[in-house]
Amino acid sequence: MSSNGHAAEAEELLSRLIRFNTVNPPGAEREAQEYLAGHLQSAGFECELLGAEPERPNLVARLRAEGAADAAAGPTLCYLGHVDTVLAHPEEWTHDPWSGEIADGFLWGRGALDMKSQVAA
């Protein structure tokens, strides 16, 4: 894949996200969202899981502008993504759809293109 430090970190994050089976239905994304929250918190974000369904929370992450006492101070950027996936039939795959395996220069798994890769980026 890439030798760039940020790219390597994104690859590892994506590989880990793929290993969470978040097939919808039933849409059990909580564990993946908690993992993402921990990753973002370690980078200085304030994170909160919100949602009507306990196993399908939304992750809201805020990063305060440097020196700002209020999270609402300064410009706002909203990034929207999802970590649920559709059903995969492992027998139809060359690589396990929940392995996050890197092979032949590609990272394989359910969500590698839609949309766990964009979330990891």
Annotate each predicted stretch with a short phrase.
Residues S2-M115, V119:
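Acidic/His- and Gly-rich active-site-bordering loop/insert found
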